[in-house]
Design a protein with these regions (language model features):
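Ligand-binding cleft/hinge of the Venus flytrap
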Residues: 58-64, 75-84, 147-148, 161-180, ...
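Alpha-to-beta junction loops
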Residues: 46-47, 83-85, 102-110, 154-155, ...
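Short helix-initiation/N-cap motifs at beta->coil->alpha
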Residues: 72, 88-98, 143, 162, ...
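Periplasmic-binding protein-like
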Residues: 130-137, 201, 205-247, 265-271
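A ligand-binding cleft/hinge motif common to bilobed small-molecule-binding domains
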Residues: 95, 112-121, 167-170, 190, ...
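Extracytoplasmic small-molecule ligand-binding "clamshell" domains
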Residues: 33-111, 120, 252
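Flexible hinge/capping segments at coil-to-helix
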Residues: 139-155
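Ligand-binding clefts/hinges and TM-proximal coupling segments of bilobed small-molecule sensing domains
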Residues: 163-176, 215-218, 246-271
Length: 271
């Protein structure tokens, strides 16, 4: 496994309920506040929260020091169509939603999953990424893990604070092992300390491409997930403008081009 790549600490980014609850109060903006679109246009800058350590989605290029990746490219596409420039604010994942609620940035473009729980606190653009949960197993694995229920009595590695952790813990009998970073659970998988790992299908392809460990892709074991741009509630003009920007990028093929560049497939459309 290549050990030099940045720390992909989480699969497709979903916070635990407790973390979400801490940022509910600051999210509610006064009714009379200006729409975010007017604020951003006047400023000429869209402040974008992202982790910056999650390749190939968002990471700092070691050669240039600039933020790069799929999310960063999507952000630049949106900003170009809004007529503003992007300003990236690197934020640790556990604090990223709270930072949005506190106004540290205008949006999050960092693989934030669209869930009913999150919609109670934030608004979202239309989805710009679609993927699904997928297992990683040892190369010589003979057991047939076709669904999560097949892992009852087995040890499953997941990312801390991820939707995959929640999904795994919802299945009685799975011995769920939580890890702060993907490299650790893949090492444990290769050496037999866990029986499988669960991650996002797009991330699985990236991890395997950059790993020399004796592991391989397993079955997809869940529904398709949708990722969108998150922002504070009460900004209908901004939401319409961002959705229009994404629709235009999808229509002219530029969003697909960015996805192909990073993943080799078009992850911007539902399968």
């Amino acid at each position: 496994m290549r050990t030099g790549f940045a720390n992909p600490t989480r699969p497709r980014r979903f916070l635990l309920a407790a973390a979400l609850g801490t940022c509910l109060l600051p999210v509610l903006a006064p009714a009379a506040a200006a729409d975010l679109l007017d604020t951003v246009k006047a400023r000429g800058v869209l402040r974008i929260g992202l982790e910056g350590t999650y390749p190939p989605f968002n990471f700092k290029d070691p050669k240039t020091g600039q933020l790069n990746g799929y999310d960063a490219d999507v952000a630049r596409l949106v900003c170009k169509r809004l007529g503003v420039r992007p300003e990236f604010v690197s934020t640790e994942w556990p604090a990223i939603l709270a930072g949005l609620g506190a106004g540290k940035y205008d949006v999050i473009i960092s693989q934030v999953g669209i869930t009913a729980q999150r919609r109670q606190a934030f608004d979202f653009s239309q989805p710009y990424t679609y993927s699904a949960p997928q297992l990683i197993v040892r190369r010589n694995e003979t057991a047939n893990y076709a669904r999560l229920e097949d892992l009852k009595g087995r040890r499953l590695g997941v990312g801390q604070g991820s939707v995959f952790e929640q999904q795994a813990k919802a299945v009685p009998g799975i011995d769920v092992r939580s890890y702060p970073a993907a490299p650790e659970n893949l090492q444990d998988l290769a050496f037999g300390r866990i029986d499988a790992a669960l991650n996002d299908s797009l991330m699985v392809a990236y991890l395997l491409k950059n790993s020399r460990l004796p592991i391989r892709a397993g079955a997809r074991v869940g529904a398709v997930e949708r990722m969108g741009i998150a922002f504070r509630k009460g900004n209908p003009k901004f939401q319409a403008a961002v959705d229009a920007a994404l629709a235009a990028a999808r229509a002219d093929g530029s969003l697909k081009q960015v996805s192909i560049k990073w993943f080799g497939v078009d992850a911007s459309r539902a399968p």
